[in-house]
Amino acid sequence: MMRLSFFIILISSYSLSLLADDTAVTLENHLAPEPLTAGEQLRSQFSYPAATRAADHAAMNWQQSHSCITCHTNGFYLIGRARSGSQAPAYLEARNFAHEFIKPHVDPDHQRKGTRTPGAEAMVATTAFLAISDMKIEGALSETTRQAFDYIWRIQSDSGAWEKWIKCNWGPYESDDHFGVSLVALALGVASRDEYTQSPQAAEADQRLKKFLRSHPPESLHQKGMLLWAAGYRNDLVKKNVVKKWQDELFSVQKLNGGWVLPELGDKNWKRSDGK
């Protein structure tokens, strides 16, 4: 459910004119999003191919214009596009970019002098996105992703969170400690078939994650949704009697078109600059 909502968010910034061509989207031919307007044309029926092309365009545009990994564009794209995009040029480019983004900071054989390591939020989230993508595409964690996990365990605090995580009220990614913890808990659940997750360092880090979640129960609907997602891959995060309660809470704010309004899932800090 949350995967679908993130996917809808990704595609909503594109008009239909971007989606008529069947040519594969690449870093070289992608189109930037057009301005949102109240009068933009809407489809009469949902089109999955159009949605995937819009996601490809969005991911490639963000990669080229910002050269980083973020939750609202190419980060969750690595998860949401995996099932249908394992051979899509844009998806393969995004996976390669994510590996190259993180490798110099976690692989001693590829370190670059003078390169500043990205902030905790970038390293942690990219590790989680890559881990889930690796499992969906390859069925196992890559060596770079394993090294990235080892890195984020070293900067994880005893509380279980990453206390240097930037918080500038840009929910859900840069708003609180809960997002990073639940995202990594999800990634470990998805990767549970990989032997790395049973290693001492991963097991100890996972205990810290669970300690944080016990002492910081979810408050917003988004936090509950993230844990419901993780609970689909592991049974040690949410009690069975709580799952139905949280599901009902999320469905109670679902709109008639099947989606959700993102600010309604967060706290007061998720409002736009105009207060809406």
Predicted features along the sequence, with ranges:
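Preference for long, amphipathic alpha-helical scaffolds in soluble/luminal domains
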Residues: 19-276
